[in-house]
Regions:
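Pyridoxal 5′-phosphate
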Residues: 5-431
């Protein structure tokens, strides 16, 4: 199909004499990111504060800010022309950047606005039938819980939630995997978990669970296969793994947390042989999807990216700056990011373990923890502890769960000195 004829059919063809705005932005990567101080210098974070809650909502590094500014300027100058000139190429570019980061095929990556959107689309679009069983846990976020409830109600399926550990700091991988897999029933069709629990900091052994499910599936027909879905947001941007390493079927994450990407962006990844299990909820605006509807592209099977990236117009200045966020991580190196985040987190946990009035909930082992560190201060609620820390200019967060712990989450924008200051502030928090 000719682009011009597609645009005429959508009523958007430009006048003959129109001058198209300059092509899409390419960020200069002339800044060296080989020291953590240089990495930090890329952010406009207030240097008078210690920022320990980037996992909640991130600040953007310079290349992301520059890309957003550029796209916003171009949209403000001539929105329709800028969109027309770039829409067909920009979204596939973003999928490609995400796919490169997770070592997957770009056709497997749908663009979303958040983890919540990805999970909502995944679970409510999941093909279940009456009597099918969904197995989940008691440690998941509101976004998973509610999406599963809507899915169960829609399909007359059941949900069972198992508790994998009573106390995260004492849990073992074997115990958790054993508890989860033992709860799988013949009618279980969907297992839904969270990679890193934002309520406790626990990191689940996703690959071991995937292998256990694969082994159960080897004795089932394709029709009875269990699908394994993961809310991956708090491992994404921390751990040095690929989708193949994780071994799940679907993976949802936003990119406005540990990836430091534009606010209102995220991905939903689907393994090719699982695509058929999900039906779309929001029509995609991809070139192939819309073109087929217009009758200008022969009807055919759409890939996951083209079918499951929800359409409607978006805050494109943000969405189209996602590539720069992935590039930023790749320029530093995924392993370096993982090692640094674990190093600072371990330092914090070791320090907190020695404070009498602190109860650390997150496992110390990096096998079972990622970048989130959860704790309680004796005699204080999590909100009170976080408020008290903020008077010392330390920005943490209280986990938004019915039972809430305080969280400090050092990342690659922090340093050892800041971690020491957090430990010192917590030593004196009751004074
Ligand atoms: C485990 C988990 N899943 C999902 C979400 C929702 O994230 P989003 O803002 O990307 O929808 C959060 C929020 O922090 C979370 O902690």
């Amino acid at each position: 199909m000719q682009r011009r004829s597609f645009l005429r059919r959508t009523g958007l063809a430009l006048g003959a004499g129109a001058v198209l705005p300059s092509l899409s932005f390419t960020s200069p990567s002339n800044v060296s990111l080989d020291s953590w101080a240089n990495v930090r210098s890329q952010f406009l974070l207030d240097p008078k504060r210690i920022h320990m809650a980037q996992m909640f909502l991130a600040s953007h590094p310079k290349p992301v800010r520059d890309a957003i500014d550029h796209h916003r300027k171009m949209f403000d100058e001539s929105p329709v022309e800028y969109w027309e000139h770039n829409w067909k190429t920009m979204e596939p570019e973003m999928c490609k950047a995400a796919a490169n980061y997770i070592q997957a095929d770009p056709t497997e990556v749908a663009l979303t606005d958040s983890t919540t959107m990805g999970l909502g689309l995944l679970y409510t679009g999941f093909q279940l039938k009456e009597g099918d069983d969904i197995l989940s846990t008691t440690h998941d976020h509101y976004a998973t819980d509610k999406s599963l409830e809507y899915a169960a109600a829609k399909n007359k399926a059941t949900i069972r939630r198992v508790t994998l550990y009573k106390e995260a700091s004492n849990a073992t991988a074997d115990e958790m995997v054993g508890t989860l897999t033992k709860a799988i029933q013949p009618n279980t069709k969907l297992v839904a978990v969270t990679w890193v629990h934002s309520v406790s900091g626990m990191k689940l052994p996703i690959r071991t669970i995937a292998d256990a499910i694969k082994s159960i599936n080897s004795n089932r027909s394709d029709q009875d296969r269990i699908y394994f879905c993961v809310d991956g947001v708090h491992g994404f941007g921390v751990e040095d793994v690929t989708m193949a390493d994780l071994g799940c079927d679907f993976f949802a994450a936003s990119t406005h947390k540990w990836i430091f990407g534009p606010r209102g962006t995220g991905i939903l990844w689907g393994r090719k042989d699982a695509w058929n299990k999900v039906v779309p909820t929001i029509p995609a605006f991809s070139y192939p999807a819309y073109g087929m509807w217009l009758g200008m592209i022969p009807q055919g099977k759409l890939n996951f990216c083209d079918l499951h990236s929800p359409g409607g117009f978006h805050s494109f200045e943000n969405r189209w700056a996602l590539k720069e966020a992935f590039d930023f991580h790749m320029q530093i190196g995924k392993k370096k990011v993982a090692d640094r985040t674990h190093q600072l987190g371990s330092m914090l946990k070791e320090g907190l373990r020695g404070v009498n009035h602190i109860k650390l909930h997150t496992p110390v082992s990096t096998e079972l923890s990622s970048g989130i560190n959860c704790f309680e201060v004796e005699g204080m609620t999590s909100e009170e502890a976080i408020k008290k820390l903020s008077t010392k200019k330390i920005i943490g967060s209280a986990a938004p769960y019915p039972i809430s712990y305080a969280r400090l989450t050092p990342s690659i924008i922090n340093n050892e000195e800041e971690v020491k200051m957090c430990i010192a502030a917590l030593e004196k928090i009751k004074e």
